[in-house]
C-alpha cells in the first residue's frame, strides 16, 4: 500500500517573540496550545504542552500534556506519557498575556529576555531561551479565505533544567523547538483526520528540520504541509512546496488506524535571500516508542467532552536516527544526521476507508 501527497503555498511571515501572546478572547470554538519538543544532550527526549479549549456550550478547559523518553542506552526504562485536564477557571493569565499558571504548573515567558520558565509539577523544571527568529502561517500558507488555523514556530531554543522520572531527578541540557497553534471557528478535528509532526535534530544541535503535515477529512480539500530549515543556528528557509509519500501499511493489534512503514519527503522553497533550497529524506520506520490512547489518560468527567471534540484520538511516536540531504542553488551543502522525532496523531478514519 502506498500513498502520495503534494502541497503548494507561499504565504508566511517572520515573527519575533513579541508575537507569542495567548489569545483567549474569541467567543466561538477555539483551541490554542503552546508546545516544546526537546532533544537532550544525554540522548533522551521530551515534550510538554499547555493548551486552552473553548468547546462551546460554556465549556472551557485547560489540558496539559508531557512526555519523557529515556535515552536508548537506558535499558528497561519505560517512557513517561501523561496529561492532566482542568476547567478553565484554573488557568491564570498574566496581564501581558505571555504567561499562564494552571494550579502548580506554569509556563512563564519574558519577551524582553526571550526566556521561558516552565514547570510541570513533579516532572519538569526547565529554563528555555529562544535564540533565533520564528515564523507564522495561516492555513499553512494557502489561500483559504476561511482562515481556520494559525501556527507559530521557533526552531532554535536552548534548554536546561531537571526532570524527575521514575523517582529520580536528573539535570538536563539540550535544544528545543517551540510550536504554537490556534484553531478557530470550528472543531480542529473537523479539519483533518491525521496530523504528522516531525523534527530532525542534527547531532550538532545547531541544524534542525521541522515538518508538519495535515491530512484533510474531506478528500476534496488540499493536503497541507509546512517545513523549516535551520542551519548553523539560523533559520534560513520556510518550505511550503512539499512532496510526501509513504509505503506499507502497518496496524497495531486492537487499533483501527493504519500506520506507514516507510516515508519519503522532498521539501522545497527558497532561502530568505532568494536561492532555491531542497531537502530530501527517506526512512524506514522502526519500532514504535509509544502508543497513546488519548481518551484513556483523560479524567472520567472529560472523556465524553473529548470524544465529541476530538473523535477517537491516538498518538503514535517514533524516535530513531535518520539523515536528510540539503541542497541550495542545486548544490549539496549539508547532511543532517541525528535524532528524528515523528509523531502521528490520528483522530478519524479517512473518508475513503
Curated annotation (Swiss-Prot):
Check the record and name the Pfam families matching this protein: Svf1 (PF08622), Svf1_C (PF17187)
A Gene Ontology cellular component where this protein is annotated is: nucleus
Cystines in this chain: none
Keywords of the record, alphabetical order, are: Cytoplasm, Nucleus
Query: Does the entry feature the keyword Nucleus, yes or no?
Result: yes
Question: Any keyword Cell membrane?
Answer: no
Compartments where located:
Cytoplasm; Nucleus
One BP annotation, GO: ER to Golgi ceramide transport
InterPro entries per record: Ceramide-binding_SVF1 (IPR051385), Svf1-like_C (IPR033394), Svf1-like_N (IPR013931)
Q: Which family does it belong to?
A: Belongs to the SVF1 family.
Under which name does UniProt file this protein? Survival factor 2
Which species does this protein come from?
Schizosaccharomyces pombe (strain 972 / ATCC 24843)
Amino acid at each position: 500500500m502506498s500513498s502520495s501527497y503534494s502541497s503548494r503555498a507561499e504565504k508566511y511571515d517572520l515573527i519575533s517573540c513579541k508575537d507569542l501572546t495567548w489569545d483567549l478572547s474569541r467567543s466561538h470554538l477555539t483551541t490554542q496550545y503552546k508546545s516544546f519538543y526537546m532533544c537532550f544532550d544525554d540522548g533522551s527526549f521530551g515534550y510538554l504542552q499547555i493548551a486552552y479549549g473553548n468547546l462551546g456550550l460554556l465549556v472551557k478547559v485547560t489540558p496539559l500534556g508531557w512526555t519523557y523518553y529515556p535515552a536508548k542506552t537506558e535499558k528497561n526504562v519505560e517512557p513517561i506519557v501523561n496529561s492532566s485536564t482542568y476547567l478553565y477557571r484554573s488557568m491564570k493569565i498574566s496581564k501581558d498575556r505571555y504567561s499562564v499558571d494552571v494550579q502548580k504548573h506554569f509556563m512563564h515567558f519574558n519577551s524582553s529576555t526571550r526566556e521561558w520558565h516552565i514547570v510541570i509539577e513533579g516532572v519538569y523544571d526547565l529554563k528555555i531561551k529562544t535564540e533565533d527568529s520564528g515564523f507564522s502561517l495561516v492555513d499553512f500558507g494557502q489561500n483559504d479565505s476561511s482562515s481556520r488555523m494559525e501556527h507559530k514556530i521557533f526552531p532554535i531554543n536552548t534548554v536546561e533544567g531537571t526532570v524527575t522520572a521514575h523517582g529520580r531527578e536528573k539535570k538536563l541540557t539540550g535544544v528545543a523547538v517551540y510550536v504554537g497553534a490556534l484553531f478557530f471557528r470550528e472543531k480542529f478535528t473537523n479539519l483533518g483526520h491525521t496530523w504528522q509532526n516531525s523534527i530532525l535534530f542534527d547531532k550538532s544541535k545547531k541544524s534542525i528540520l521541522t515538518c508538519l503535515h495535515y491530512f484533510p477529512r474531506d478528500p476534496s480539500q488540499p493536503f497541507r504541509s509546512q517545513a523549516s530549515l535551520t542551519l548553523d543556528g539560523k533559520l534560513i528557509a520556510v518550505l511550503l512546496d512539499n512532496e510526501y509519500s509513504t509505503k506499507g501499511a502497518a496496524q497495531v493489534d486492537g487499533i483501527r488506524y493504519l500506520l506507514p512503514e516507510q516515508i519519503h519527503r522532498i521539501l522545497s522553497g527558497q532561502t530568505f535571500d532568494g536561492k532555491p533550497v531542497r531537502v530530501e529524506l527517506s526512512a524506514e520506520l522502526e519500532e514504535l516508542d509509544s502508543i497513546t490512547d488519548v481518551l484513556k489518560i483523560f479524567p472520567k468527567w472529560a472523556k465524553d467532552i473529548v470524544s465529541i471534540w476530538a473523535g477517537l484520538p491516538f498518538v503514535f511516536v517514533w524516535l530513531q536516527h535518520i539523515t536528510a540531504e540539503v541542497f541550495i542553488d542545486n548544490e549539496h551543502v549539508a547532511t543532517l544526521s541525528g535524532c528524528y522525532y515523528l509523531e502521528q496523531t490520528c483522530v478519524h478514519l479517512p473518508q475513503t476507508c
